[in-house]
C-alpha cells in the first residue's frame, strides 16, 4: 500500500527528517513511501487518502490534522494522547491506538485499511463554537482577580 508522509519539517526537525528518509530507504520502502514536503493542498491529500495516521510520539495540544481528516470523512488513527486522543475519543474511537503497543497498533491499522468503519457525518468542533469558547475563557481570565 503506497503511503505519503505529508508536510514539511521545521529547521529544528531536519535531522529527524533525514533519519526518517534514511530508514525508509534502508528498509527498501522508498518506492512505497513518498515524502511530499510542505504543501498548500494538504486538504486534497487528506481527502484522497484511505486512512490518515497521526503518530506523533509527543502529545499534540489540538490535533488539527486529525480533525480535518475526520471532517472529510477519512478514517483516521492516532495515539491516544493529547488532542488527537481527545478528538478520536469523541468522533472516531475506532482509530484510537495505544502509544507504545506496536503490535496492537499494526493490527488496528490493518483492520481500518481492510474494513474501515464509516466516519460519522457531523460538524464536530465547529469553528464558531471553538472561537466563542476561547474568547469566553479569555474574558473570564481578564476579569479574574490578580494574585
Predicted regions, residues:
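Active-site donor-binding acidic/aromatic loop of nucleotide-activated sugar
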Residues: 12-17, 30-39, 45
Amino acid at each position: 500500500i503506497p503511503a505519503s508522509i505529508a508536510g514539511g519539517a521545521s529547521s529544528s526537525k531536519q535531522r529527524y527528517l533525514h533519519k526518517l528518509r534514511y530508514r525508509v530507504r534502508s528498509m527498501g520502502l522508498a518506492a512505497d513511501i513518498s515524502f511530499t514536503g510542505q504543501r498548500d493542498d494538504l486538504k486534497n491529500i487528506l481527502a484522497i487518502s484511505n486512512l490518515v495516521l497521526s503518530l506523533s510520539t509527543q502529545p499534540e495540544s489540538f490535533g488539527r490534522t486529525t480533525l480535518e481528516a475526520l471532517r472529510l470523512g477519512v478514517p483516521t488513527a492516532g495515539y491516544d494522547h493529547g488532542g488527537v486522543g481527545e478528538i478520536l475519543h469523541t468522533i472516531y474511537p475506532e482509530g484510537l491506538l495505544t502509544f507504545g503497543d506496536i503490535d496492537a497498533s499494526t493490527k488496528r491499522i490493518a483492520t481500518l485499511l481492510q474494513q474501515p468503519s464509516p466516519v460519522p457525518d457531523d460538524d464536530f468542533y465547529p469553528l464558531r463554537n471553538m472561537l466563542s469558547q476561547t474568547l469566553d475563557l479569555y474574558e473570564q481570565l481578564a476579569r479574574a482577580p490578580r494574585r
